[in-house]
């Protein structure tokens, strides 16, 4: 197995971390049409970009990544995308020829993704362009980007967890300043950066720089990893009404929950990238999607939010789609079919995937 793993690593090129060295123009970037996958997963819809039925170029989104989806509490789906490229004044300081935004939001009422995900509206500026939700100076070594990693609705308020990126490092690696919450009371139109929720990239808080949310029994469960990919995953929880109060968070130490002690958190899974977690009615289990060290998209299952989590199952083999990252689960139940978004870095856009459970 060790020899096979080494061969696999040398045969593929994983997704880069730096989003500035990209080309989102179809054909010119070497891509045309949806990825052709032969395994258990199929690419079913181009969600963003010039080749998408959503025509996101109409609001100056030529390329983007992530696609973190959640229900706003009223049957509307909100989707936050990360670093976003368009035409306009280039962000040369960050090494990009594109006009850059770090976090944008679209809305949809699509609860059946079988024919795709279609957007109803976008948070935009006076020119109709998708705009940053939370401002970022985009200055290397200070804050080069502020990227959403999780979203959730609690008591009519929308919350996003964002990471403040200091530097882009080696392939699949970056360094953050901190993570923290932003909140919106108007369906994602305007956002307040909640500075008192910032987790500095040090000590136990370093394990919660990138997040995923799920809710159960009045609790919000927050999954966390260090900045970058191929790190252990951790979990905390907090009562819904206390989501913005870091002192009320409890951390799973491998056997019990410990309140207020972030250093007590023990790993619940190893070698993960960006995370997405959701209860699945068909399986009667929680499902976790992420990428593995070979850059395959993988799934784990568990009967409770803290686990124990199963060994990973490959949903998209890296040999079929080596630049895929950040799988994000569609937030509504869809029976035996599991739908999720995945970024394809070499086209720098987001694709809807479907796999049979």
Kindly label every feature range from the protein language model.
Residues 1-17:
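Secretory targeting and sorting signals
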Residues 20-62, 71-144, 153-203, 219-270, ...:
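Beta-rich carbohydrate-recognition and catalytic domains
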Residues 68, 150, 276, 288, ...:
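Short, surface-exposed charged micro-motifs
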Residues 149-151, 211-212:
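Short amphipathic beta-strand and strand-loop transition segments with alternating hydrophobic
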Residues 201-215:
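Flexible gly/pro/ser-rich segments immediately N-terminal to CXXCH heme-c attachment motifs
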Residues 209-212, 273-280, 323-331:
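Beta-rich, blade/repeat-based domains predominating
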Residues 315-338:
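C-terminal structured domain segments
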């Amino acid at each position: 197995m060790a020899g096979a793993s080494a061969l696999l690593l040398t045969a593929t090129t994983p997704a880069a971390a730096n989003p500035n060295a990209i080309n989102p123009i179809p054909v010119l970037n070497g891509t045309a049409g949806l990825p052709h996958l032969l395994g258990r997963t199929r690419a079913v819809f181009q969600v963003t970009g010039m080749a998408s039925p959503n025509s996101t170029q109409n609001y100056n989104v030529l390329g983007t990544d992530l696609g973190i989806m959640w229900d706003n509490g009223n049957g509307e789906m909100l989707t936050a995308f990360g670093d976003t490229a368009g035409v306009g004044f280039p962000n040369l300081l960050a090494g990009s020829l594109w006009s850059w935004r770090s976090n944008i939001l679209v809305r949809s009422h699509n609860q059946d993704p079988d024919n795709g995900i279609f957007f109803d509206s976008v948070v935009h500026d006076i020119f109709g362009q998708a705009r940053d939700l939370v401002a970022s100076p985009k200055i290397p070594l200070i804050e080069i980007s502020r990227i959403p990693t999780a979203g959730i609705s609690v008591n009519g308020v929308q919350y996003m967890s964002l990471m403040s990126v200091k530097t882009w490092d080696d392939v699949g690696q970056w360094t953050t300043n901190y993570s923290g919450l932003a909140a919106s009371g108007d369906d994602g139109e305007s956002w307040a950066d909640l500075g008192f929720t910032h987790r500095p990239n040090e000590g136990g808080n370093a394990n919660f720089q990138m997040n995923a949310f799920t809710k159960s029994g009045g609790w919000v469960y927050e999954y966390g990893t260090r900045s970058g990919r191929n790190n252990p995953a951790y979990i905390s929880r907090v009562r819904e009404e206390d989501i913005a109060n870091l002192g009320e968070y409890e951390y799973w130490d491998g056997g019990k929950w410990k309140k207020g002690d972030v250093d007590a958190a023990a790993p619940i899974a190893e070698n993960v990238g960006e995370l997405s977690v959701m209860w699945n009615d068909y399986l009667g289990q929680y499902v976790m999607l992420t990428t593995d060290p070979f850059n395959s998209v993988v799934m784990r299952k568990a009967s409770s939010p803290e686990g124990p989590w199963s060994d990973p199952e490959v949903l998209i083999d890296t040999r079929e789609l080596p630049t895929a990252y950040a799988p994000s689960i569609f937030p509504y139940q869809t029976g035996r079919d599991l739908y999720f978004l995945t970024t394809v870095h070499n086209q720098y856009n987001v694709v809807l995937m479907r796999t049979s459970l």
